[in-house]
Amino acid sequence: MSKKMVSLFLVLLMVFSATASLAEGSEIVVTDMFGREVTLSEPATRIVVMQPSDCEILCAIGCEEAIVGRGQYVDYPASILEVPVVQSGAETNVEEILALQPQVVLMNSMSQSEEQVKQLEENGVKVVVSTTSNIESVYTAIRLIGKLMGKDAEAEAVITDMQTTFDEIKAKTSGETKKVYFEISPPPYLYTAGSSSYMNELAEICGITNIFGDQEDAWLMISEEQVIERNPDYIVLITNMGSAGVEEILSREGWGDINAIKNQKVFNDDDSCMARPSPRLKDAAIELYNFVYEIEAEEEPAA
């Protein structure tokens, strides 16, 4: 082999090695919150997001433009309403999702069946599961999605912002000893938050006690009698019923002797920030603090 041929071979080998190293360096490997390892050749640029909280995380780290489809309950921020809707949960239409040509579908562990996941993966779509119940798991979801999108630094900045707000609120609480009840759904199927939920943590951050904080489950079904017996000083509605929900609970039969009802200390989560385990939990903590300590919005304890 001539010297020219050897030199050409070495140059080509170096180019190939550099290209291979570049490709290897851009590969994304994540372990989702269901313990499944997912590998992408590069950060995702086309994604269908099935649940509201994950959409809010994507937008918070600057990836809204990568969202090509959304579940029917995904509605924040308002600009996301222009993105095509796909059915979620048991009604998920795989063909509808595939038509949007996503690289990744981001979903909740309870939302889609194994068969639907299998169909998506057989068609080359990566499925990443995000599932949250407490604040630490929200941080995990933010880091997961940040890595998936090649936005690790942005994800850490969002987490730091949340932590800073929580710490500032904790420093301002006055050792309040009163109790709060979170109503997630109204009668006849009353659901509330237990000790392993982020709502319980929001109460702790604000220096108050969740009346069902002695229950280990994150979410649990309860009876009206239990609420009446535990006599909360504050009630927070996460029922998505607007002002009608407040009016209903204030006039609910048998609840008239509850402190929160007598003093009309009922707060409605009308912007859904308490309902969603997303970066807006920061806003939820501010709203709860302002409600409990009767502070006007412009006097927020954190930016």
Positions of PLM-derived features:
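A short, structured surface patch at a secondary-structure boundary
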Residues: 45-100, 104-110, 208-211
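Short helix-initiation/N-cap motifs at beta->coil->alpha
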Residues: 33-35, 84-95, 215-224
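Extracytoplasmic ligand-binding site segments that recognize negatively charged/polar headgroups
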Residues: 115, 130-144, 177-198
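Short helices/loops that flank or line small-molecule/ion binding pockets
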Residues: 94-102, 222-231
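His/Asp/Glu-enriched short active-site or ligand-binding loop at hydrolase and phosphoryl-transfer sites
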Residues: 71, 196-219, 267-268
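Flexible loop/hinge segments that line or gate small-molecule binding clefts
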Residues: 73-79, 111-144
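Structured C-terminal subdomain patch of bacterial secreted/periplasmic proteins
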Residues: 46, 92, 137-140, 144-147, ...
